[in-house]
Design a protein with these regions (language model features):
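Ligand/cofactor pocket segment of small-molecule handling proteins
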Residues: 27-31, 35, 41
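NAD(P)-dependent Rossmann-like dehydrogenase/reductase catalytic/cofactor-binding core
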Residues: 4, 17-21, 25, 46-56, ...
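Flavin (FAD/FMN) cofactor-binding and adjacent substrate-gating region
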Residues: 1
Length: 154
């Protein structure tokens, strides 16, 4: 279950990184999104009885780094265009390929809510994709999260 969760969630996190790049944010913002996203993967794995350290392996961190770091990633590319245009419709017109993170963001949020796990990065992407939040408002919301101890498994 951990590998499956990590695979679905990395696509959503790659969207968030792409959005931040498209909006002109730099590596610090990308690192924040990847780190918090990885923490969300680990917490969801733990809540579903999987080893949360799965998130630290190739199926988690490895896939996450590849998807978030590669300009060839469909999820990151979709996010970049969305971050530049601010329009989900325009982005869908420009990207005619399947983008897993767009389809799975809402479902991952539902899974997290069922088990009581907070997933602010994933939630923000789902809100952008469903049109209830602009990329600017979503990133602002994420930046306003108070800094606290981010234990990898909690």
């Amino acid at each position: 279950m951990g590998c499956e969760l990590a695979g679905a969630i990395k696509s959503v996190i790659a969207l968030s990184v792409g959005i931040s790049i498209g909006m002109g944010f730099g590596e610090n913002t990308q690192a924040m999104l990847i780190t918090r996203g990885l923490n969300e993967v680990a917490r969801l794995c733990a809540a579903h009885g999987s080893d949360p350290l799965t998130a630290a392996g190739l199926a988690g961190m490895g896939d996450l780094v590849a998807s978030c770091g590669s300009p060839l990633s469909r999820n990151r590319t979709f996010g970049e265009i969305l971050g530049r245009t601010g329009s989900i419709e325009t982005t869908r017109e420009q990207v005619a390929k399947t983008v897993e993170g767009v389809a799975s963001a809402g479902a991952v949020v539902e899974i997290a809510h069922r088990v009581g796990v907070e997933v602010p990065v994933i939630e923000s992407v789902a809100d952008i994709v469903n049109g209830s939040l602009t990329p600017e408002a979503a990133l602002q919301r994420l930046m306003e999260i108070t800094t606290k101890a981010e234990n990898f498994i909690r």
